[in-house]
Amino acid sequence: MPFYGGEELATVYDEALDEGFGLIASNIAEPNIMMGLMEGADRMDSDLLLQMSGGACRFAGDGDAVAGLKAMGNYIETIAERYDIGVFLNMDHQTDLEFIEQQIELDIPSSIMIDASHEPFDENVATSREVVEMVEAAGSDVLIEAELGQIKGVEDEIEAEEAFYTDPEQAVEFVDKTGADLLAISVGTQHGVAKGKDLELRPDLANDIRQALRDHGLDTPLVLHGSSGVQPDQLQEMLKHGICKVNKDTRYQYEYTRTAYDRYNEEPNAIVPPEGVADARDTFFNETDWSPNKDVFDPRVAGRDIRERIADVHADLTEVSGSAGQSLFK
């Protein structure tokens, strides 16, 4: 299926709100993660929302975020054609307005998340509204996600030492003034490595925010950031209250590295010289009796394991979130 835009993504969110499921928004720090995500989503008949941060774009573009976005956009579009699901791209935690304007002009993302949550309320409103107006001026169908409240932890070099819960009435004012299509709320999750048992999650607050918005005629999809440590039962409880986009990044990063670590530790002497053999990498071990084993160190060997593991993890997450079997583009 094609790599879709904001208009089609909006229909997925409408369905998610109606049916009570969540779309797992999955960050791609590296291409093998993307490949695994596509395989896992297709296996479970779930539409797929990929995400890229500014840091991921710079990494893909060797320091040039625009080049990285173009390269990954082409890659996603080409690979997405092989699968019978809808594939979308959200730009996660964007703070650079110039880069956001370039994203809109390139017409690559399906949606963009403007993160001005660290600013005072009025400045957050003004910045978020400015991005919405960029989309309107361009005649684009890109959806805009904005954040109100602050989530503790570090995400793509954005650090918050404290968490500030989202106020329901302020949420109504924020959505009304900004025109944001989606609202990311702070209800006790945490960016980075966090344990669900240690999180003070507030499904009651998510419910209050959802109800306050609906009371004012705003059927705005809610977004849960910092969910890698949230346990299945906790997530399913949150999904009952208007959450229909659930961000995952840290979990995939860990699974990527752990899978490679496990693979290489199965046969360490095929990669690293055993004790007593000189570590003569500069001559590629020409003068030693030992040689590395290409069948083990070929990066595609670990890469295939990584793709398979990411696919399995994402497939499990679609079952937990309820998006399995819900693709609108099958």
UniProtKB/Swiss-Prot annotation:
InterPro entries: Aldolase_TIM, Class_II_FBP_aldolase, FBA_II, Fbpase2. Induction: Expression is highly up-regulated in presence of fructose. One of its GO terms (biological process) is glycolytic process. Its EC number is 4.1.2.13. Binds 2 Zn(2+) ions per subunit. One is catalytic and the other provides a structural contribution. Optimum pH is 7.5. Dihydroxyacetone phosphate binds at G192, G226, S227, S228, N247, K248, D249, T250. It catalyses: beta-D-fructose 1,6-bisphosphate = D-glyceraldehyde 3-phosphate + dihydroxyacetone phosphate. D-glyceraldehyde 3-phosphate binds at S53. Signal peptide: none annotated. Zn(2+) 1 binds at H93, H191, H225. Keywords: Glycolysis, Lyase, Metal-binding, Zinc. The keyword Lyase applies. Gene3D superfamilies: Aldolase class I. SUPFAM superfamilies: Aldolase (SSF51569). Pathway: Carbohydrate degradation; glycolysis; D-glyceraldehyde 3-phosphate and glycerone phosphate from D-glucose: step 4/4. Disruption phenotype: Loss of growth on fructose, but growth on glucose is slightly stimulated. Loss of growth on acetate, D-xylose, or Casamino acids. Its cofactor is Zn(2+). EDTA is an inhibitor of catalytic activity. The active site is at D92. Catalyzes the aldol condensation of dihydroxyacetone phosphate (DHAP or glycerone-phosphate) with glyceraldehyde 3-phosphate (G3P) to form fructose 1,6-bisphosphate (FBP) in gluconeogenesis and the reverse reaction in glycolysis. Is required for the utilization of fructose as a sole carbon and energy source. Plays a role in gluconeogenesis during growth on acetate, D-xylose, and casamino acids. PANTHER family: D-TAGATOSE-1,6-BISPHOSPHATE ALDOLASE, D-TAGATOSE-1,6-BISPHOSPHATE ALDOLASE SUBUNIT GATY-RELATED. Belongs to the class II fructose-bisphosphate aldolase family. NCBIfam families: Fbpase2_Halo. This is Fructose-bisphosphate aldolase class 2.
